[in-house]
C-alpha cells in the first residue's frame, strides 16, 4: 500500500495527468530486462513472470503435455495460483458458458462500423459489451470476477470476428 502512495497510483487506468497503474506494484507480473554482471547492469533477453511463474515454464509445460495453456494462465492471473485439474475443469466450463455474445452484437458492433486498427476494434467491443451488463456498477468481488471471466471468455471472439471481417472486406 505504501508504494501506491509513494508512486501516486490512481484507481483505474489513467488520471488526468496520464498516470496509470504500475504493473510491478500488483506483483501479478514481473519482467527482467537487465542482469548484474561484474557489478554492471547489462541488457538481457527479456523474462516474463506471472505470479512468480516464468512464462517460459508455463508455455513449456503446456506444450509438453499437448494442451492449451490459455485458461490455466487466466486462472493463475485471476486467483493467484495454478489450478488443480478439478479447478481448471470448473473454470473452463464457466468460461465456455460465458463464451457467447448477445444477439446481433457482431453485426451491430463489429460489422456495421469496422475500424482499421485491431486495438481500436477490441476496445470498442469491450466498451460496447458493458451496455449489456445490468450490474456494471456492482463492484462486489463475485460480480467483478464474473465480469473478468466474461471478458476472458469473449475477448478471443472479438479478435476472431474482427479479423474475419477484415479478411472478407479485403476480398470484396
Language-model features, listed with the residues they occupy:
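Hydrophobic alpha-helical bundle cores within soluble ligand-binding/oligomerization subdomains
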Residues: 1-172
Amino acid at each position: 500500500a505504501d508504494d501506491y502512495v509513494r508512486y501516486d497510483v490512481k484507481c483505474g487506468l489513467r488520471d488526468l495527468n496520464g498516470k496509470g497503474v504500475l504493473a510491478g506494484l500488483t506483483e501479478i507480473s514481473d519482467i527482467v530486462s537487465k542482469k548484474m554482471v561484474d557489478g554492471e547492469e547489462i541488457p538481457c533477453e527479456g523474462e516474463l513472470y506471472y505470479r512468480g511463474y516464468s512464462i517460459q515454464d508455463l508455455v513449456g509445460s503446456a506444450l509438453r503435455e499437448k494442451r492449451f495453456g490459455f485458461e490455466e494462465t487466466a486462472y493463475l492471473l485471476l486467483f493467484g495460483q495454478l489450478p488443480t485439474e478439478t479447478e481448471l475443469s470448473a473454470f473452463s466450463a464457466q468460461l465456455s458458458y460465458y463464451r457467447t455474445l448477445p444477439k446481433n452484437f457482431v453485426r451491430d458492433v463489429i460489422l456495421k462500423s469496422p475500424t482499421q486498427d485491431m486495438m481500436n476494434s477490441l476496445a470498442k467491443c469491450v466498451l460496447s459489451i458493458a451496455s449489456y451488463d445490468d450490474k456494471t456498477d456492482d463492484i462486489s468481488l463475485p460480480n467483478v470476477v464474473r465480469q473478468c471471466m466474461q471478458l476472458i471468455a469473449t475477448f478471443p471472439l472479438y479478435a476472431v470476428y474482427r479479423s474475419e471481417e477484415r479478411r472478407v472486406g479485403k476480398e470484396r
